[in-house]
Amino acid sequence: MTTLTLAKDFTREYKNNGQHLEQLFRYSLTGERVKADNIKADKGTDFAQYSIKSARATICKGRDLAKHLATDKATEFVYITKTEIAYIMSKAEYIEFVAEFGTVTRESQKNGGYEKTRLGHETRVLIEWLEQRA
């Protein structure tokens, strides 16, 4: 696992935290400011080889992370903290991370009522876990 401190000279464009962090991560690596997209994991990646997540992010529909990752186009997985530090993980590290900090919730009935795997809130324990492995 490696880390990257993200750029501080970046003006937020999105209210949605996931879109903002995806855009910030790309800007930090390339200097490009591009609109965040909404590509399904089996069709493409958030950026280059990366799948980018933060606290409370949805990982996949249902509980089967292995099935989801079998079709995910990403080869590296990024968790970005509230302090805008990116932890870049291999698939094996990401599986361990989601097993430790993922939860299964149910979508509202209005939106189909299906189960989904999500990351929980960012906690001290989560940050310590990442720091110990970086």
Q: Predicted segments — roles?
A:
Residues 1-134:
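Nucleic-acid endonuclease domains
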